């Protein structure tokens, strides 16, 4: 099922939550809506579901204008962060509930067979008689997904589905959800503020800020070609160095960096990931002093300050004996350069 949003707008009182958003989601695509709190990602998801109505624009499911279609008639499956399971029902009863109230009537035998099939799909065979309180958080989220799939939705919507779980469980469930999606091929949209989650799971990532789309693309595209300092900072650890562009070249103090810049002269911000920086005892890069060294498994994280006052973080091999107070240079191997706003 292809989904299309055309110039969608949503306002709560005087707050514009979604600003003129247009977006195409291809049939069978796994799409992540990624952004900080207040970026509009959950509001967009709720409008696709029919839980909120837009104040302007249109939403299409395939060729059908679904803008004003009630939620129960849209054919969506919804998974929330906090499971929303019925505590007084067994897992079997929770999964069966949607089928019992659906417009598509099934007899008990058909419902029981479908529940068994779904319990197998989410790897909870034999646990149908248990109650939600008797299983782990990760297992509850699997039940929530099985319940969403029980009504054979055209579209699967997930709102921060792993946010309430610990890091190791989240990683396991991410791999599992990707496998489920690949086997079923249902158009899936999920909301997250977790950059790693979006980049690990999605075919395409839509990055939002202040109610609008700021960039979209494959995980590779948005990571390698961030189009703004916001995207660069939001997607992961980023060091910022103040510089100047002059005559197509970039300088930090008197040090010329090995990058060209064609967007005119003036102040620029130079962004680099920790892995794009190297520490040298020789003074061939940006002069800096080591402020602190954090020892971690397999690496050492160095925090250094440049003579211009910028704070940089980068990693060195565990055998490197750099220590606080050392003087040296930071060499920037790769960077993204943006004009100062």
Swiss-Prot record:
InterPro entries per UniProt: AAA+_ATPase, ABC_SmlMolc_Importer, ABC_transporter-like_ATP-bd, ABC_transporter-like_CS, Mo/tungstate-bd_C_term_dom, P-loop_NTPase, Sulph_transpt1
All copies of domain ABC transporter, residue ranges: 3-235
Topological category with respect to the lipid bilayer: Peripheral membrane protein
Family annotation (SUPFAM superfamilies): MOP-like, P-loop containing nucleoside triphosphate hydrolases
Gene3D superfamilies for this protein: P-loop containing nucleotide triphosphate hydrolases
Gene Ontology, cellular component aspect: ATP-binding cassette (ABC) transporter complex
Task of the protein: Part of the ABC transporter complex CysAWTP involved in sulfate/thiosulfate import. Responsible for energy coupling to the transport system.
This protein's name: Sulfate/thiosulfate import ATP-binding protein CysA 2
Taxonomic source organism: Agrobacterium fabrum (strain C58 / ATCC 33970)
Lineage: Bacteria, Pseudomonadati, Pseudomonadota, Alphaproteobacteria, Hyphomicrobiales
């Amino acid at each position: 099922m292809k989904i299309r949003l055309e110039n969608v707008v949503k306002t709560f009182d005087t707050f514009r939550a979604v600003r003129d958003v247009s977006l195409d989601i291809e049939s069978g695509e796994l799409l992540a809506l990624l952004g900080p709190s207040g970026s509009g990602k959950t509001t967009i998801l709720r409008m696709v579901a029919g839980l909120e109505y837009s104040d302007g624009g249109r939403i299409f499911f395939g060729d059908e204008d679904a803008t004003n279609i009630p939620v129960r008639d849209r054919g969506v499956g919804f998974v929330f962060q906090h499971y929303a399971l019925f505590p007084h029902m067994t897992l079997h009863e929770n999964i069966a509930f949607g089928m019992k109230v659906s417009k598509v009537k099934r007899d008990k035998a058909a419902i029981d067979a479908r529940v068994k099939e779904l319990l197998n799909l989410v790897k909870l065979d034999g646990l149908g008689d248990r109650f939600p309180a008797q299983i782990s958080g990760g297992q509850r989220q699997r039940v929530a997904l099985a319940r969403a799939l029980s009504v054979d939705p055209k579209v699967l919507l997930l709102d921060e589905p792993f946010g309430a779980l610990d890091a190791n469980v989240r990683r396991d469930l991410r791999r599992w959800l990707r496998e489920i999606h690949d086997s079923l091929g249902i158009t899936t949209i999920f909301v997250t503020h977790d950059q790693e989650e979006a980049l690990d799971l999605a075919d395409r990532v839509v990055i939002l800020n202040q109610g609008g789309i700021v960039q979209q693309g494959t995980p590779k595209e948005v990571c390698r070609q961030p189009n703004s300092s916001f995207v660069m900072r939001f997607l992961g650890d980023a060091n910022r160095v103040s510089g100047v562009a002059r005559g197509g070249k970039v300088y930090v103090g008197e040090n010329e960096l090995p990058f060209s810049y064609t967007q005119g002269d003036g102040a620029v911000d130079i962004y680099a990931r920790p892995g794009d920086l190297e520490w040298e005892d020789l003074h061939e890069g940006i002069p800096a002093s080591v402020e602190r060294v954090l020892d971690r498994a397999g690496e050492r994280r160095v925090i250094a300050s440049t003579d211009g006052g910028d704070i940089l973080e980068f990693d060195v091999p565990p055998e490197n004996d750099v220590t606080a107070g050392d003087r040296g240079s930071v060499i920037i191997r790769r960077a993204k350069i943006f004009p100062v706003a």
